[in-house]
A protein has these predicted regions:
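Glycine/threonine-rich beta-strand-loop-alpha-helix active-site module
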Residues: 75-178
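N-terminal small/polar loop signature for handling phosphorylated ligands or for N-terminal nucleophile
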Residues: 43-115, 229-240
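Gly/Pro-rich interdomain helix-loop hinge
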Residues: 272-348
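N-terminal amphipathic/basic leader segments beginning at the initiator methionine
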Residues: 1-29
Length: 382
């Protein structure tokens, strides 16, 4: 067994109704003034107000920023950080999907240490602890509530920059399945596929360890058995719980094992064409599965048996089956089949390939990958 390191420096509360624990959690952080970062949809639906009321009834002051967008930008981080500084808040609550959480992590850095988030791009450039952060996911997808990453779009470069630091890991994550009922089917599908891909890429990663593999396997089991049910009926509490737990385990898995070519390639797609992250990942999923098959085949049957409606023995399983199962799942969930379906053209392929190759995920992809391979996958997926 190869050497590995694994630690989880975080507190996680999971279950129906744990949102009500928010004041107590804030109190453990010494919080007197919370700053909620969320999006306009959750604000309109009253979810932000619900969270705000829970805090104010406990005597905790609250300020809000409800202007995060999909693929959040450097400018959004700057505006939110200025609002945090002006408010005097001493802890941040990230409420929503991956976008508010990415913004909140970045804001926790910039509001405390100054400068632009671009100055912290890369690994281990955050000088110390950020403003204490509590994450409350309302989608089952990114796993950002437990990860050490923040991904922010730099429109000046048409580039999605990544900040990696263990300082970004939130102090607390509150996972309440009752909050997942407001997601539209299309969002539930894209987020669910994203979570599944987190588990799959971490599972076949060259950095996978027994701990990360165990989490990946459990994530794939939970997501595989419930994603179709949840997308069809977001009010199904059992399916929502499976999806939320699966997303959590997948997030923990890739925090330590990292990801692969799918994420390396999807970030440029989103940066150049503003395609939702989960949709971009989902489109690329079968093409990268096909590319990696020779190197990762030994693990493919377990992935297949978790996501397919059929089970195969070792004797029955053969090449191409996982790719086909992914295509069938995407079709069932309404994920587009081609990049051209979401407006992507060859115009930016050269720069997109260059940007994908900058990703640290390329190095841990199970099959060695060069720029010509990335370009070839983009071409095939078009």
């Amino acid at each position: 067994m190869k050497r590995f390191t694994f630690s989880v420096p975080q507190n996680i509360l999971f279950g129906e109704g744990v949102l009500k624990e928010l004041p107590g959690v804030a109190g453990k952080l010494g919080g007197k003034h919370g700053f909620i970062i969320s999006g306009p949809t959750l604000n309109r639906l009253g979810v932000v107000g619900q969270c705000e009321e829970i805090l104010t009834q406990a005597g905790i002051a609250v300020s809000t920023f409800c202007d995060t967008e999909g693929n959040p930008s450097v400018e959004t981080v700057e505006r939110a950080a200025e609002a945090v500084r002006a408010s005097g808040a001493d802890f941040i609550v990230a409420l929503g999907g991956g976008s508010p959480m990415d913004v909140a992590k970045a804001v926790g850095v910039v509001a405390k240490y100054g400068g632009s988030i671009t100055e912290y791009e890369g690994a281990d450039k955050v000088p110390g602890a950020i403003i204490p952060l509590i994450t409350i996911p309302t989608t089952a997808g990114t796993g950002s509530e437990v990860t050490a990453f923040s991904v922010i779009t730099d429109h000046k470069r048409n580039y999605k920059l990544t900040v990696f630091s263990y300082e970004l890991i939130p102090a607390y994550a509150l996972l309440d399945p009752t909050l997942l009922t407001s997601a539209p089917a299309s969002v539930a599908a894209a987020c669910g596929v994203d979570a599944l891909i987190h588990a799959e890429e971490a599972y076949v990663s060259l950095d996978a360890s027994p701990f990360s593999e165990a989490m990946s396997e459990k994530a794939m089991e939970l997501i595989g058995r419930s994603i179709r049910t949840y997308v069809a009926d977001r009010s199904n509490r059992e399916a929502a719980s499976d999806m939320l737990a699966g997303s959590l385990f997948a997030g923990m898995a890739f925090s330590w094992a990292r990801l692969g070519n799918i994420h390396a390639m999807s970030h440029p797609v989103s940066a150049f064409y503003n395609v939702p992250h989960g949709v971009a990942n989902g489109i690329l999923f079968p093409y990268v599965v096909k590319y990696n098959e020779e190197a990762a085949f030994e693990k493919y049957r377990k992935i297949y048996n978790n996501i397919s409606t059929e089970k195969k023995s070792a004797e029955e399983f053969s090449k191409g089956m996982l790719e086909q199962a992914v295509r069938e799942l995407n079709k069932q969930l309404g994920i587009p089949a081609k990049l051209s379906d979401v407006g992507v053209t060859r115009e930016h392929f050269s720069q997109m390939t260059e940007d994908a190759m900058k990703s640290g995920n390329i190095a841990v992809n199970p099959r060695k990958t060069g720029s010509e391979d990335i370009l070839g996958i983009y071409e095939e997926a078009l």
